[in-house]
């Protein structure tokens, strides 16, 4: 018989550096999950990724306090900032542009995020990522 699911916990944790401090500790502690077990498993799964990259993770907590977790691809905004070499996006994206990014790079990001996105095809996902870039103050050029 399948285990009864008690909760889903969604967090963004930096790759290779999960530790019991907030936000991980309190979120898992409330549900009675073994925090160190999660931290060790998460760090092992993300050790090959660039250190410090924010990784969205969905933790499924079962009624017997066991858990499973699924890692997703980094947020599009993080990948865009990394590709454009920026620390942060524009505070006024419609009037103040902070950088440019090539459409080919945007398409590459869309293909990387394809597993997590709900787009019809790569072209639609590319347009979605372009919209994210524009809302950050980036200019998308051919």
From Swiss-Prot:
Post-translational modifications reported in the UniProt record: One or more lysine residues are methylated.
InterPro entries named in the record: Ribosomal_uL11, Ribosomal_uL11_bac-typ, Ribosomal_uL11_C, Ribosomal_uL11_C_sf, Ribosomal_uL11_CS, Ribosomal_uL11_N, Ribosomal_uL11_N_sf
Source organism, top-level taxon: Bacteria
GO process terms (BP): translation
Pfam family, one: Ribosomal_L11
Role, per record: Forms part of the ribosomal stalk which helps the ribosome interact with GTP-bound translation factors.
Protein name as catalogued: Large ribosomal subunit protein uL11
Species per Swiss-Prot/TrEMBL record: Shewanella amazonensis (strain ATCC BAA-1098 / SB2B)
Upper taxonomic lineage: Bacteria, Pseudomonadati, Pseudomonadota, Gammaproteobacteria, Alteromonadales
């Amino acid at each position: 018989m399948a285990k009864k699911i008690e909760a889903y916990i969604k967090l963004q944790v930096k790759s290779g550096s999960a530790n019991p401090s907030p936000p991980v500790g309190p979120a898992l502690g409330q549900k009675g999950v073994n925090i160190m077990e999660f931290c060790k498993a998460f760090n092992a799964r993300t050790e090959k990724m660039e250190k410090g990259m924010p990784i969205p993770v969905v933790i499924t907590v079962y009624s017997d306090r066991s858990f499973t977790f699924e890692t997703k691809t980094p947020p599009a905004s993080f990948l865009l900032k990394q590709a454009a070499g920026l620390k942060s996006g524009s505070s006024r994206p419609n009037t103040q542009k902070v950088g440019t990014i090539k459409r080919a790079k945007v398409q590459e990001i869309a293909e990387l995020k394809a597993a997590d996105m709900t787009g019809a095809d790569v072209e639609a996902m590319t347009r979605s990522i372009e919209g994210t870039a524009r809302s950050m103050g980036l200019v998308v050029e051919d």
